[in-house]
């Protein structure tokens, strides 16, 4: 029994397996944490910043993915696997992304398409979108017109670029002027003082066989009231029977635009669209034709110089996008026509002459810019080029190259600042020694002329004194009483 008591019970040895498991588990957890940190915090994609411009939009304006969107990885694999060629570098544009419904949906504009009527005409349904006021557009148009008026006055002494020479050449075109009318002299031109006001702009969709899904068209109301927009001419009617110039009847006319209002339609004509069928214009007179050829050559040389400065090859025959504009037939054009016929026995303000002139002016206007006829104007090239890069004057921070370009611009614009003191109402005059005088009431209008390319008018300012004589004076006439 003592032997059993003295016998010690062996203590089982502590296994070191639990320590190894804990060590490995700790290391594995640390590795997992580091891997998760690297994956989600370092290589993870940052969330897109919230857009401040679209924060006020409703949730219904969220953009939806296009049905033409492909997998990003698939696109990358294909772009890396396939070697692009010159013909497939530019991806084709889906036709559904350029139609009117897609454009209206992506720009959040609700427009009702037009429905064709029984007679084949398009019945216009106004958009449910709120019409635009176009106040900003009126300011830009007013600045553009004011710049044209100032430029026309600065170029009044140019022998080839003045509006007076261009008008005289267009009015005396031998292919259009009848043989019984003598040489037409422009005696007074006024470009006006007011500006057109555009309002109530809305977008509609019209059917167009040349484009998929129709074509979008902007309609805006325009109103112009200016009593200083006028032109005055003098000429003579020739009686060529029984012999040439057997009798001469002096005639003086003054046409003024009292008011113009209508609905302007503007739409974009893509470059792929075939050009609209327009009647071929008659050839211009030699002087105007020479000027137009010189201007076209100068513009082509300027564009070529810009492209060479940018290191780009010159464009040859590249298509251009165009803007087509016209007026609806329900326009309003009020004219004021003053006439003076005769030398000794003078007839003043003959109603029949006023009716003939107004009818001809309306016909001239409708043949050019009234539906279904439109005017197509090519959009300018807006690609940034070094040849037409400038620096705004008055900037404090400028480099040496900017200072050099600024000095060059200031030299070019030095003459333009001389015309800042001129009033907005500018008036052309030709033949100051012999011209009929008209009163200053309702000086506004256009005349039935082919103006051609009128880039620069010659203008002479005239202060509106209001003391002009109500009596017409014809060149070479006596001071007798006027017969009405």
From Swiss-Prot:
Alphabetical GO biological process terms: mitochondrial genome maintenance; mitochondrion-endoplasmic reticulum membrane tethering; phospholipid transport; protein insertion into mitochondrial outer membrane
Task: Write out the GO cellular component annotations.
Answer: endoplasmic reticulum membrane; ERMES complex
Indicate, by first and last residue, each region the UniProt record lists as having compositional bias (Basic and acidic residues).
413-427
Residue ranges annotated as compositionally biased, kind Pro residues, are: 272-286
Instruction: Answer yes or no on keyword Endoplasmic reticulum.
Output: yes
Tell me any Pfam family this protein matches.
MMM1
Query: From which domain of life does this come?
Result: Eukaryota
Ranges of compositional bias, category Basic residues: 54-64
How is this protein positioned relative to the membrane? Single-pass type I membrane protein
Residue spans making up a coiled coil are none
Q: Which residues lie on this side of the membrane: Lumenal?
A: 1-22
Keyword Endoplasmic reticulum applies: yes
Location comes to: Endoplasmic reticulum membrane
- InterPro entries hit by this protein: Mmm1 (IPR027537), MMM1_dom (IPR019411), SMP_LBD (IPR031468)
Domain SMP-LTD, by residue range, is: 130-380
The protein's assembly and partners: Homodimer. Component of the ER-mitochondria encounter structure (ERMES) or MDM complex, composed of mmm1, mdm10, mdm12 and mdm34. A mmm1 homodimer associates with one molecule of mdm12 on each side in a pairwise head-to-tail manner, and the SMP-LTD domains of mmm1 and mdm12 generate a continuous hydrophobic tunnel for phospholipid trafficking.
Q: Which PANTHER family match?
A: SMP-LTD DOMAIN-CONTAINING PROTEIN, TEX2 PROTEIN-RELATED
Q: Which HAMAP family match?
A: Mmm1
**Family assignment?**
Belongs to the MMM1 family.
Q: What is known of its domains?
A: The SMP-LTD domain is a barrel-like domain that can bind various types of glycerophospholipids in its interior and mediate their transfer between two adjacent bilayers.
UniProt-recorded name of the protein: Maintenance of mitochondrial morphology protein 1
* Taxonomic path: Eukaryota, Fungi, Dikarya, Ascomycota, Pezizomycotina
């Amino acid at each position: 029994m003592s032997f059993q008591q003295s016998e010690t019970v062996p203590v089982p040895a502590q296994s070191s397996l639990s320590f190894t498991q804990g060590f490995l588990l700790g290391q594995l957890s640390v590795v997992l944490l580091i891997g998760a940190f690297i994956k989600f915090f370092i290589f993870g994609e940052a969330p897109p910043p919230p857009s401040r411009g679209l924060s006020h939009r409703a949730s219904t304006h969220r953009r939806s993915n296009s049905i033409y969107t492909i997998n990003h990885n698939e696109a990358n694999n294909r772009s890396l696997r396939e070697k692009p060629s010159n013909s497939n570098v530019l991806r084709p544009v889906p036709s559904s992304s350029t139609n009117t419904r897609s454009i209206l949906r992506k720009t959040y504009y609700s427009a009702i398409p037009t429905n064709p009527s029984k007679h084949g005409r398009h019945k216009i349904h106004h958009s449910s979108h709120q019409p635009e006021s176009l106040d900003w557009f009126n300011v830009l148009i007013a600045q553009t017109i004011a710049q044209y008026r100032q430029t026309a006055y600065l170029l009044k002494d140019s022998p080839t670029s003045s509006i007076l020479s261009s008008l005289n050449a267009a009015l005396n075109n031998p292919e259009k002027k009848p043989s019984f009318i003598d040489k037409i002299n422009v005696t007074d031109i006024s470009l006006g003082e007011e500006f057109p006001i555009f309002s109530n702009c809305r977008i509609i969709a019209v059917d167009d066989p040349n484009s998929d899904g129709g074509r979008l068209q902007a309609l805006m109301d325009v109103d112009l009231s200016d009593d200083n927009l006028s032109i005055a001419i003098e000429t003579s009617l020739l009686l060529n029977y029984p012999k040439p110039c057997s009798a001469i009847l002096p005639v003086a006319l003054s046409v003024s635009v009292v008011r113009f209002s209508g609905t302007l339609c503007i739409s974009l004509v893509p470059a792929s669209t075939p050009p609209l069928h327009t009647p071929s214009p008659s050839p211009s007179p030699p002087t105007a034709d020479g000027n137009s050829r010189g201007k076209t050559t100068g513009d082509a040389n300027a564009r070529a110089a810009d492209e060479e400065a940018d290191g780009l090859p010159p464009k040859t025959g590249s298509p251009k996008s165009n803007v087509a504009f016209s007026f609806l037939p329900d326009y309003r054009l009020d004219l004021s026509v003053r006439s003076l016929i005769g030398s000794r026995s003078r007839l003043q303000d003959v109603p029949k002459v006023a009716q003939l002139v107004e009818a001809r002016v309306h016909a001239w206007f409708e043949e050019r810019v009234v539906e279904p006829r439109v005017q197509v104007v090519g959009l300018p090239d807006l690609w940034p080029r070094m040849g037409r890069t400038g620096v705004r004057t008055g900037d404090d921070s400028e480099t040496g190259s900017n200072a050099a370009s600024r000095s060059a611009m200031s030299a070019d614009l030095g003459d333009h600042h001389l015309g800042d003191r001129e009033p907005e109402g500018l008036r052309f005059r030709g033949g100051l020694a012999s011209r009929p005088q008209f009163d200053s009431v309702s000086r506004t209008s256009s005349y039935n002329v082919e103006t051609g390319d009128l880039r620069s008018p010659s203008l002479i300012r005239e202060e509106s004194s209001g003391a002009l004589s109500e009596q017409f004076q014809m060149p070479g006439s006596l001071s007798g009483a006027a017969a009405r």
